Amino acid sequence: MDMRVLAQLLGLLLLCFPGARCDIQMTQSPSSLSASVGDRVTITCRASQGISNYLAWFQQKPGKAPKSLIYAASSLQSGVPSKFSGSGSGTDFTLTISSLQPEDFATYYCQQYNSYP
């Protein structure tokens, strides 16, 4: 069974909080990919400058609000299956789905929330 998993950077929707460094550009790849159930899927996100580990990953399904998967680059949100994992620091980050399942069809995006010291 083939599924299409979208990895999309929603740069225009990134929020600017007081003190946040909103000049940081995020680049996510691939923009889209095709994968099969059981595949290991990796999505990468690169920041234009170092953001330490201030990086979150979200999953969004059509008609639904975004769901937080990972915070602080590698910390799994409560209730999120362990098939999801995050890694990286500085400028390069990855989200990995260890064994893709039909319910994982979604858009995935990263968000930086680095702030000034």
From Swiss-Prot:
Q: Does the keyword Transferase apply?
A: no
UniProt main location, coarse? secreted
Residues in the signal sequence: 1-22
Q: Looking at the record, which segments are called Complementarity-determining-1?
A: 46-56
UniProt-listed InterPro entries: Ig-like_dom, Ig-like_dom_sf, Ig-like_fold, Ig_sub, Ig_V-set, IgV_Light_Chain
Compartments, record wording: Secreted; Cell membrane
Q: Which UniProt keywords apply?
A: Adaptive immunity, Cell membrane, Disulfide bond, Immunity, Immunoglobulin, Immunoglobulin domain, Membrane, Secreted, Signal
The answer to whether keyword Membrane applies is: yes
Q: What are the recorded Gene Ontology BP terms?
A: adaptive immune response; immune response
Region: Framework-1, residue numbers? 23-45
Which superkingdom, per the lineage?
Eukaryota
Name of the protein this chain belongs to? Immunoglobulin kappa variable 1-16
